[in-house]
């Protein structure tokens, strides 16, 4: 599938701004998620890349979405269809949720540890990161035994490598230079 990020950005921003203005962020998130799932359907994908007129395509897409998409969501779909951009809906949805998380001061944090973390350890990591990042943190914890010990934390552009493997690699690099 092609990368539609650049194409999707203005649509996502417009939908986000409208949703904020109307106080309907969650509703718009649900609508866009549903429309993105429809757009990713194999049969619908073929229609989107076909030669159907924009009006017919918008009409068909809106009919498939049914009551899952309100009149304002339908207007977005019509505009995207007129511009031949319905295939970018999954990227519009993704970018919308990025904007929503920024707006809600929330960040996804990946925590990779050498062993399974307890609930108490996860809560402690979450609390410390919320203080440091000044955002609400959503932890996604996983285990990688290759780390030997410690953790790696990834939050947006921030990476904290406090693993034994990372320390050994840094020590090795220092000794080689």
UniProtKB/Swiss-Prot annotation:
SUPFAM superfamilies: N-terminal domain of the delta subunit of the F1F0-ATP synthase. One of its GO terms (molecular function) is proton-transporting ATP synthase activity, rotational mechanism. It is a peripheral membrane protein. The keyword Secreted does not apply. PROSITE patterns: ATPASE_DELTA. GO terms for cellular component: plasma membrane; proton-transporting ATP synthase complex. Keywords: ATP synthesis, Cell inner membrane, Cell membrane, CF(1), Hydrogen ion transport, Ion transport, Membrane, Transport. It is found in: Cell inner membrane. It holds the Pfam family OSCP. Signal peptide: none annotated. PANTHER family: ATP SYNTHASE DELTA CHAIN. F-type ATPases have 2 components, F(1) - the catalytic core - and F(0) - the membrane proton channel. F(1) has five subunits: alpha(3), beta(3), gamma(1), delta(1), epsilon(1). F(0) has three main subunits: a(1), b(2) and c(10-14). The alpha and beta chains form an alternating ring which encloses part of the gamma chain. F(1) is attached to F(0) by a central stalk formed by the gamma and epsilon chains, while a peripheral stalk is formed by the delta and b chains. F(1)F(0) ATP synthase produces ATP from ADP in the presence of a proton or sodium gradient. F-type ATPases consist of two structural domains, F(1) containing the extramembraneous catalytic core and F(0) containing the membrane proton channel, linked together by a central stalk and a peripheral stalk. During catalysis, ATP synthesis in the catalytic domain of F(1) is coupled via a rotary mechanism of the central stalk subunits to proton translocation. This protein is part of the stalk that links CF(0) to CF(1). It either transmits conformational changes from CF(0) to CF(1) or is implicated in proton conduction. Belongs to the ATPase delta chain family. HAMAP family: ATP_synth_delta_bact (MF_01416). This is ATP synthase subunit delta. It comes from Vibrio vulnificus (strain YJ016). The gene is atpH.
């Amino acid at each position: 599938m092609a990368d539609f990020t650049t194409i999707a950005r203005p649509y996502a921003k417009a939908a986000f701004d409208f949703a904020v203005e109307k106080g309907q962020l969650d509703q718009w998130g649900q609508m866009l998620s549903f429309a993105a799932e429809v757009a990713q359907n194999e049969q619908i994908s073929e229609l989107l890349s076909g030669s159907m007129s924009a009006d017919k395509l918008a009409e068909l897409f809106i009919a498939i979405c049914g009551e899952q998409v309100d009149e304002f969501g339908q207007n977005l779909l019509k505009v995207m269809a007129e511009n031949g951009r319905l295939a970018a809906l999954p990227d519009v949805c993704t970018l919308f949720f990025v904007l929503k998380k920024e707006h809600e001061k929330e960040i996804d944090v990946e925590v990779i540890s050498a062993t399974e973390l307890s609930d108490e350890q996860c809560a402690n990591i979450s609390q410390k990161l919320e203080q440091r990042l000044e955002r609400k943190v959503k932890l996604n914890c996983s285990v990688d035994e290759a780390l030997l010990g410690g953790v790696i934390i990834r939050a947006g552009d921030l990476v904290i490598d406090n693993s034994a493997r990372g320390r050994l690699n840094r020590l090795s690099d220092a000794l080689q230079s």
